[in-house]
Regions:
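Sec-dependent signal peptide cleavage junction
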Residues: 19-35
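Beta-rich interaction/scaffold domains
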Residues: 50-245, 539-620
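Catalytic domains of carbohydrate-active enzymes, especially glycoside hydrolases
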Residues: 246-301
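Active-site groove signature of glycoside hydrolases
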Residues: 293, 371-398
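Aromatic-lined substrate-binding rim segments of carbohydrate-active enzymes
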Residues: 299-353, 400-403, 407-418
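Aromatic-lined carbohydrate-recognition surfaces of secreted/lumenal glycan-active proteins
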Residues: 348-362, 408, 412-430, 483-493
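Substrate-binding cleft/loops of secretory-pathway carbohydrate-active enzymes
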Residues: 359, 364-370, 426-454
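Substrate-binding cleft of secreted/luminal carbohydrate-active enzymes
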Residues: 452-540
Length: 620
């Protein structure tokens, strides 16, 4: 999905120069600037006026000024054609985040003395490197080009159009020509959707007992391209009519994601996690159970590791590097050590994931493996790239080949059997060429439909919307020689995956298997583990009430705050009501009716009116 974020500045005076979103407030610390050091002092001595200004700076502002003044990307040593982007981009991004955290008076002072201009110039050069390293030749690029355009516009407004052209020459020669490709991508999507819908309609119209009719529809399906087949929503009906006994053998992993924030207030105990993974094993018996286990979550400008380190770890020094420590505090949450001991004994493999922020990934790896590397269950380390050098939603930086290779080799130096996984919803944030045995993970969400016939949470133009299965196919096709993991099951997708055959976890995974050529894995996100259509045995009465209220919210008909289904049924969406909307309403009614009287009485009364409205709308 093309998820979007806002570019926000804390100060009106620097609004147009705010190229990266604001970070969380905190004391400024000086990072390791090895890659930023200049070989010669080419900075002129400060004037008396500048000295006076500097004396007015707080210690934090002075530190930020020193950091910006030393950015190597603004020196003659910088070679734009050959520079490795991560060596220059990361210091600039950190400097911006620290600048945005300064009080408004300090920001104004650094604007007045020219420091902010130096920062924006550095950001402009980084943007040029980003354009240089992005193919800008496929539909996936649409998920990042709008960010590039906003950043170029901000540079242009802050520094002037002529300076922007000088610092970002690839904007005109490489970026702008991409716009000429967009109509072709949109037409291709329309053609693929049309072809898929024609076959889908034939599937629904055929008599499954008529062998000739089934064979004819099967021929229609086989004549589609691989991508067009991903637009066929009801292929399972044809599969059943053909009596095809698919083994879905390319699904070789199954499991769940675990986070301190995903399950709500009450966590699962080790044997309860195993009940969930046992159910997945029943659905996918050929798979290795794996857990995507978040051990380091975003905190402030860095990463909080959820354990108490050994006494020889200098936690104060690490805090200055944006690495913090605290034990999880959710009800029923045991220490990670206790979970891993249980997983050791039950053949459950674990990938330890971090949301690094501005923390150094290699350092995080060392700390985590020093703590847990003796557990046989540990299979590797994962990085959620959405939070790599980013602390606001979707502001993380793309991982270059050099960076991916560095992390991969670092992990394998610890244990050659360990694997790295990299997670993002857009392939352009993942290494363009370096592969090794990296697991690539897609956690895209917010789709309006499985096949791109309706707008999703983040969408504006239906012609740009691929849909769940086509988008995941685009992702997996980008890494044909590597295993991929699909982190799926987000609540923002329930309004369409609830309409699939029960069990929905199996139906969703099977269709993903069919559009995937290589080995893959199904990772169910913890947000909807406690859900009536996924793993209902994990639900308490409070969980049943919570999930029912959430589902009722999908039927809200309000034009501004409503749910996707509710708005379509109310006629206030740009999309018409769809046949699957009727199925979803029926599913919600079944769930409400399954509640006890006490649970029904605890539901939000206003949300219950949404169901009344929806049932009336589909009955018309």
């Amino acid at each position: 999905m093309k998820k979007k974020f806002l570019l926000i500045s804390l100060s009106v005076c620097v609004l147009t120069a705010s190229i990266i979103g604001c970070g969380s407030a905190g004391a400024v610390t000086e990072p390791d600037t090895t890659t930023q050091e200049t070989e010669a002092d080419d900075t002129a001595a400060p004037s008396s006026q500048e000295t006076e200004v500097n004396q007015d700076l707080s210690a934090d502002a002075a530190s930020v000024k020193k950091m910006i003044d030393s950015l190597a990307i603004n020196t003659d040593a910088f070679q734009p054609d050959s520079a490795e982007i991560s060596e220059y981009r990361e210091p600039v991004t950190l400097a911006r985040s620290l600048f945005d955290n300064l009080p408004e008076e300090d920001q104004k002072t650094l604007d007045a003395d020219g420091t902010l201009t130096l920062l924006v110039q550095a950001e402009a050069r980084v943007l040029n490197l980003w354009i240089r390293d992005t193919p800008l030749d496929s539909v996936e690029d649409g998920g990042i080009t709008w960010i590039m355009e906003e950043r170029y516009d901000a540079v242009s407004e802050a520094l002037g159009e002529d300076t922007a052209k000088e610092l970002v020459p690839l904007y005109e020669t490489k970026f702008l020509p991409y716009n000429d490709l967009i109509p072709g991508f949109q037409e291709e999507k329309r053609e693929n959707l049309k072809a898929g819908q024609e076959v889908d309609a034939a599937i629904l119209d055929m008599d499954p007992s008529d062998a000739d009719a089934v064979a004819e529809v099967a021929k229609m399906y086989d004549n589609l391209t691989d991508m067009q087949q991903a637009y066929v929503e009801h292929y399972s009906v044809l599969r059943d009519a053909l009596n095809k006994k698919e083994d879905f053998s390319n699904i070789i992993y199954s499991g769940t994601r675990s986070s301190v924030y995903g399950l709500g207030d009450t966590w699962l105990l080790p044997d309860e996690w195993k009940q969930v993974t046992d159910q997945l094993q029943e659905w996918y018996p050929q798979t290795q159970t794996i857990m995507v286990w978040i051990i380091g979550s975003l905190s402030g400008m860095g990463c909080n590791l959820e354990f108490t380190p050994s006494s020889d770890v200098d936690t104060e020094a690490l805090a200055k590097q944006y690495i913090y420590f605290s034990e999880p505090d959710r009800e029923n949450h045991l220490s990670h050590e206790e979970y891993f001991k249980y997983f050791d004994d039950n053949n459950i493999k674990v990938y330890l994931q971090v949301e690094p922020g501005f923390a150094d990934v290699d350092t995080l790896i060392d700390l985590i493996m020093d703590q847990y590397g003796d557990h046989p269950c540990i299979a590797g380390i994962g990085v959620d790239v959405e939070w790599y050098h980013g602390v606001t939603e979707d502001s993380g930086l793309p991982v270059s080949d050099a960076l991916a290779e560095k992390w991969d080799k670092h992990i394998k130096e610890i244990n050659p059997e360990y694997r790295l996984f990299l997670k993002h919803y857009n392939i352009r944030y993942l290494p363009p060429a370096y592969r090794s045995d990296i697991l690539f993970v897609n956690d895209s969400q917010g789709f309006g439909s499985p096949v791109g016939d309706a707008l999703g949470t983040y969408d504006e133009n239906l012609d740009d919307v691929l849909g769940f299965f086509p988008e995941f196919k685009h992702f997996t096709d980008a890494f044909p020689d590597n295993d991929v993991l699909y982190q799926i099951g987000y609540a923002s997708d329930e309004s369409w995956f609830y309409t699939m055959d029960d069990p929905v976890v199996l139906s969703l995974g099977q269709r993903l298997s069919e559009v995937t050529k290589q080995n893959c894995g199904i990772i169910w996100v913890d947000f909807t583990i406690k859900d009536p259509k996924t793993f209902p045995f994990t639900q308490s009465s409070a969980d049943r009430i919570k999930s029912a209220n959430r589902l009722l919210g999908c039927l809200n008909p309000d034009e501004e705050e409503g749910g996707l289904v509710g708005k379509r049924l109310a006629g206030v969406s740009s999309d018409p009501a769809l046949p699957r909307d009727t199925v979803f309403v029926e599913k919600v009614r079944e769930i409400i009716d399954s509640l006890t009287d006490e649970e029904k009485n605890a539901l939000d009364p206003e949300r219950l009116t949404y169901l009344d409205f929806a049932e009336s709308a589909v009955a018309e």
